[in-house]
Amino acid sequence: MRNVKYGKCVRCGKTYDAVPDLTNCTCGGILDIVYDYDYIKSVLTKEKLAKRDNRSMWRYRELLPVEETTPDTPLRVGWSPLYEEPKLAELLGIKKLWVKDDGQNPTASLKDRASAMAVAKAMEAGAKTIACSSTGNAASSLAGNAAAAGIKTYIFVPERAPKGKVAQLMIFGANVISVKGNYEDTFKMSAAAIDKYGWYNRNAAINPYLSEGKKTVALEIAEQLNWEMPDYLAISVGDGCTIAGVWKGFKDLYAIGFIDKLPRLISAQSLGCYPINRAIQEDKPWEPMEENTIADSISVGVPRNADKALMAIRESNGIAVNVSDEEILAAQRLLGRTCGVFGEPAGVTGAAALKKACEEGLIPHDATVVSVVTGNGLKDVANAIKSAGEPIHIEPDLELMVEEFKKRGVTVE
């Protein structure tokens, strides 16, 4: 890969050749992929990019750690819609707001970006099997992307994973192991099995290439905004890989001169599990927390990518905002009713944090903001029903319907 120099440990600085099955440093630190920006600037321009018909994450190949001969993965991942939302911006009291709906990806979450990268690197490594642990989205994402590429998967999920997500990955033909325990127990089980059988490792905090896939959401946002950066970007945080990837994407664009400023990050976590945000708020090393939130995709008490996530938040002069489950469900309704965007609880936690930050005066009124919805609401129907409530139940009689409308104060226009 001419565009890649090496992998570098964010903890001790040791460097490694960027081989397809690259994992953690011997010191236990996470690796970062280091690029040759001078080379990239010589082969990629805004004009060249604008002429490309490829509307997927692979349109940014010069900024991705894949061989030139590696084909695009079969499913079209990326180039999700970015909606300008003036009504919601006015409601929040800010200048401009855009909502990036990554629930429109093939398996309905941002995790498809990481899984597509995992499949590409597994193909480069000649691997026939990929494995990971997941609270749900990474699992279904890997299962779908790997199925399309003809690669077998073994996926470990905690037993609390929503049935809809488990059903999705079962439909994709994954070998699913439901672990009686929390996410940390599940992660350890997957790591032991991967070590025993030699499967390709899709765990985001172990495989440094996955955050490179996730960073494509930032590359898209920048291009969709014609390279004019927002002041803030709000996104939900669990393991830490996504927010780290987003920051890496913006830094890459800044390094090659495509953008002239970097946004501040709004790190959104649930009050039921916020180890990364707590480290920011208390200015201390992160510590494990119990997992107790409806936002299952970010319910990670032992974040394996905390080092990169904390670096991203601090480098961006970011804001850490914790929200309750009730605030998350309220944000789910708000996005649905003002924007027509249906996100799962973890997917709308960024929007919930943005709303709270605006209410607390942390965001100036002249600010421009992008809020990323990381997963589709159909992934967690039970909590969607809890958020939205029940329909009006009546007998097939129009007069009874009119009476029920009166009782409920329903205004007919």
Region spans (language model):
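PLP-dependent amino-acid enzyme catalytic core
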Residues: M1-E413
